[in-house]
């Protein structure tokens, strides 16, 4: 949101709290994992499609999630039978959405994320384990180190405060700019960038 405000760019941000199965999932993952992941997948597809219909074709946008997030979390949360079924829905959704040009992966250790989760004090997240976060982190990195049609920038935020420290934020922006301009493309097409946070949802 700070980047969007700084550059007056439209942003698409996930409203995870609307998922009616999320709190139940944290209490009983085995019972609600398929429901929570399917809801997130369908909502992400719908939100991306609706948002892109409202903007100009060549307009730069930033999103704090991508559909790839659905695959990464479902692989961690679903059993093999449900995952195989889920992948069919994921691939259908993937075919409906244009890939981003750039993904900025804000990297942080599981311990750092666990501390942030505790400080924000959401009751339903209190039992999240560092092991779970480590598995999610490994899922993200295993996915993004592969060759893709889009560019991926890994940026470590463990020692940075992007919210309260302008120097840290400006360093991120400069890093993104320098990384992007290494490519000789003359312009950016939508969707421009997706900020991926290796969080717990």
Regions found by a protein language model. Give the residues of each.
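Walker A (P-loop) phosphate-binding motif
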Residues: 1-3
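Conserved substrate/cofactor phosphate-moiety recognition/catalytic segment
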Residues: 5-43
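Conserved beta-strand segments of alpha/beta enzyme cores
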Residues: 10, 61, 151-153
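Hydrophobic/aromatic beta-strand patches that form the interior of the parallel beta-sheet core
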Residues: 12, 102-104, 153-155
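Conserved nucleotide-binding/hydrolysis micro-motifs of P-loop NTPases
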Residues: 16-19, 67-68, 108-113, 159-162
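Glycine-rich phosphate-binding loop used to anchor ATP phosphates in small-molecule kinases
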Residues: 32, 36-98
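A glycine- and Lys/Arg-enriched "phosphate-lid" helix/loop adjacent to the NTP-binding pocket
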Residues: 70-141
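NTP-dependent small-molecule kinase module
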Residues: 118-127, 131-201
């Amino acid at each position: 949101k700070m980047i969007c405000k700084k550059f007056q760019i439209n942003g698409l941000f996930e409203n995870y709290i609307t998922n009616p199965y999320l709190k139940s999932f944290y209490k009983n993952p085995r019972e609600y994992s398929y429901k929570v992941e399917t809801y997130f997948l369908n909502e992400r597809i719908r939100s991306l499609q609706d948002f892109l219909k409202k903007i100009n074709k060549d307009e730069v946008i930033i999103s704090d999630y991508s559909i790839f997030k659905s695959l990464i979390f479902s692989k961690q949360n679903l059993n093999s039978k449900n995952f195989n079924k889920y992948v069919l829905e994921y691939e259908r959704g993937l075919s409906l959405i244009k890939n981003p040009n750039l993904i900025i992966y804000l990297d942080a250790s599981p311990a750092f994320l666990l501390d942030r989760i505790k400080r924000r004090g959401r009751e339903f997240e209190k039992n999240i384990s560092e092991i779970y976060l480590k598995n999610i982190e490994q899922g993200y990195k295993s996915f993004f180190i592969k060759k893709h049609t889009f560019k991926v920038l890994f940026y470590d935020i463990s020692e940075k405060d992007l919210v309260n420290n302008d120097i840290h934020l400006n360093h991120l922006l400069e890093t993104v700019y320098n990384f992007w301009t290494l490519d000789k493309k003359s312009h950016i097409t939508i969707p421009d960038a997706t900020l991926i946070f290796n969080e717990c949802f």
